[in-house]
Design a protein with these regions (language model features):
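Disordered, low-complexity "stalk" and linker segments at domain junctions of extracellular
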Residues: 35-233, 245-261, 582
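Beta-sheet repeat architectures centered on beta-propellers
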Residues: 1-38, 43-61, 117, 138-140, ...
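A short alpha->loop->secondary-structure connector
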Residues: 81-82, 300-306
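Flexible gly/pro/ser-rich segments immediately N-terminal to CXXCH heme-c attachment motifs
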Residues: 175, 308-312
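Flexible, glycine-rich phosphate/dinucleotide-binding loops
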Residues: 72, 121, 169, 231, ...
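Surface-exposed loop/turn positions within WD40 beta-propeller blades
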Residues: 22-25, 69-71, 79, 280-281, ...
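N-terminal beta-propeller domains
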Residues: 1-41, 74, 86, 115-125, ...
Length: 583
């Protein structure tokens, strides 16, 4: 799933979805006001788990898609077709003497490029072909140069470049529509091509982007991480020129001069597993056990400084997400395979934030065959959602939810704020935030809610709506830690209590008082938070609640038995205690 912005108007957002049937079939679709199918120029590889490793990135109104196919190329939706980025290098041209009765002499060097034009504006250009060396026989007036077979990548014209020096400057001497396959060259050797030609661009300026695994955008350039095809590039960070740089099709090419890539320790620590950013001006790149920070330098010949931040922490693929901390400062969340949830704060410090759920984390199946994790940050609720596979599951079956506003920084890392969600919506192979009016065929709302694509059936769920989980009832509950008012050497009794909840019509809970780690439990059913006269908070007395000989007390709040009719919020529980004789 991906939310694509084809314009600067966010109400024009499109929802893109890829559905797969095992290893046999796939459907790539986009929704504007209706759903339509998109046919990629290169079919997705549906074996080896690659069908679950597709990622997208919006830039300049285009949707760049990183996926494995038979071609080692990045792909892009340009509004009309899903094609390969850039244009491949064509083959070398051929040439022959033509125009009898002349005296054209001197060895020439020819090469061709393919270009796409819109009117007179060049949109894309290929690298030059290999060079053809041709020596005219001296008895003809011209040389007829014939273009090679087309690359079939959307070129509208081809360019002929010529030089009198194999290793010298080349000049564009013709730009011709692809339907015309020949160009006649009658330039005298003594005149040369610099007089009437246009200096050609350098070799290495229009390298097509290979099949990267992960994509980011830094201001107006595309950043490509890893590779589906080449193990030597699995730890590579590469980037396109800035959009207003000289040249054309800048978001669809890689330059070799200046060098526009860096290899992050190559094989050490394995392949790149993803990246996030920029966050506070920094791009964060992860391997399974390494973390790197890249910072823009402003220097064209060395665009990024990259340093290793940690070689003992790393991230599971799909688990990295930008969010905010409890203070509202931008930060990065990720799942380290060993210790689970972690956070990189605004000061660049890596902190563990999953100690409170480490028992649950130990059930996560890092060897899941298809998908280990998916993640998103739900801004409206200040929540980080991770969908993970547990035990023997090969796809996510549990959702870990961190309520960031409830977290606290401690000497043990970031603590508190955790909830564990199961049910149908936890089984997500794909997630994104999208407009809450996705079902309406109107301009898209700017209120974005989590949408999940399930692991069974061609179903996309819009979450954070209603009081069930796609028709399945569930029980929401929260349990506090045990509290000891004095010490565990002293007992006390409970004679009465009260609970404070947000006023909501039809909202009710069952409240349990737990003595000494489960030694005894009293449950008060149907605590109702319906308002009586417009109050915003409801205080409900807890009558007939008597319990003695407690050393600790804990509380459990759960959906009232019989089903959920409204959402509830418990804000405070108070007990009146009766001291007893301590032991």
């Amino acid at each position: 799933l991906h939310r694509h912005l084809p314009t600067t108007d966010e109400s024009d957002a499109e929802l893109w979805a890829l559905a797969v049937t095992g290893t046999s079939a796939s459907d790539l679709c986009r929704k504007t006001t209706t759903w339509s199918t998109v046919a990629p120029v290169d079919a997705l590889t549906l074996t080896g788990g690659y069908q679950y490793q597709v990622s997208g990135q919006t830039l300049h109104g285009k949707l760049f898609l990183a996926y494995k196919s038979a071609e080692d190329r990045l792909h892009v939706w340009d509004g009309t077709s899903l094609r390969r980025c850039g244009i491949a290098q064509p083959a070398a041209p051929t040439a022959a003497d033509s125009g009898g009765g002349g005296t054209l002499s001197g060895t020439r060097y020819y090469r061709t490029r393919e270009v796409e034009l819109s009117g007179t504006v060049v949109l894309r250009r290929s690298e030059p072909s290999d060079t053809l060396t041709f020596a005219p026989d001296g008895s003809h007036a011209s040389i007829t140069v014939t273009k090679p077979a087309s690359t079939g990548e959307g070129a509208t014209h081809w360019e002929l470049e010529a030089s009198l020096d194999l290793n010298g400057d080349y000049y564009r001497i013709a730009r011709t529509i692809v339907g015309t396959t020949t160009v006649a060259d009658s330039v005298a050797y003594g005149t040369g091509y610099a007089v009437s030609g246009t200096l050609a661009e350098d070799v290495g300026d229009y390298e097509p982007i290979p099949s990267a695994k992960y994509l980011l955008v830094d201001e107006d350039r595309l950043i490509c991480l890893g590779s589906f095809e080449d193990a030597a590039l699995a730890a590579r960070m590469a980037w396109t020129p800035v959009y207003n740089d000289t040249g054309v099709g800048n978001d669809e090419r890689i330059t070799l001069d200046p060098v526009s890539y860096k290899d992050l320790d190559t094989y050490e620590g394995g392949e790149i597993t993803g990246g996030v950013g920029p966050v506070n001006g920094e791009i964060w790149i992860f391997k399974w056990s390494h973390i790197y920070k890249a910072v823009r330098t402003g220097v064209r010949t060395d665009a990024y400084d990259v340093i290793a931040i940690s070689k003992s922490r790393g991230a599971i693929p799909g688990s990295m997400v930008e969010g905010v901390d409890q203070f509202g400062s931008p930060c990065v969340y990720f799942l380290d395979p060993r210790v689970g949830p972690c956070r990189i704060g605004s000061n660049g410090t890596v902190m563990r934030c999953g100690k409170d759920i480490f028992t649950t984390w130990q059930t996560v199946n890092l060897d899941a065959a298809n998908v280990v994790a998916r993640s998103l940050f739900y801004r409206a609720a200040s929540q980080v959602h991770w969908f993970v596979a547990t035990d023997d599951a090969d796809a996510p079956d549990l959702r870990l939810v961190l309520h960031v506003e409830q977290t606290r920084d401690t000497q043990d890392g970031v603590r508190r704020g955790w909830a564990i969600w199961d049910g149908p919506s936890a089984s997500a192979l794909a997630v994104c935030r999208y407009a809450d009016n996705v079902d309406a065929n109107v301009a898209r709302s700017l209120y974005l809610v989590p949408c999940v694509g399930l692991s069974t059936g061609a179903t996309i769920l819009r979450t954070d709506t209603g009081t069930d989980d796609n028709g399945t009832s569930y029980v929401a509950e929260a349990e506090t830690k045990p509290h000891a008012p004095n010490t565990i050497m002293h007992t006390f009794g409970v004679v009465s209590g009260s609970v404070l909840g947000t006023a909501t019509a039809g909202a009710s809970v069952d409240l349990s008082i737990i003595r000494d780690f489960g030694l005894e439990t009293i449950t008060i059913a149907g605590v109702d938070f319906s308002p009586e006269s417009g109050e915003t908070q409801v205080m409900v007395p807890l009558d007939n609640m008597t319990m003695g000989e407690l050393r600790t007390v804990a509380f459990r709040v759960a959906d009232a038995e019989g089903g959920v009719s409204a959402r509830w919020a418990v804000n405070q529980i108070a007990l009146k205690q009766q001291p007893e004789q301590g032991a």
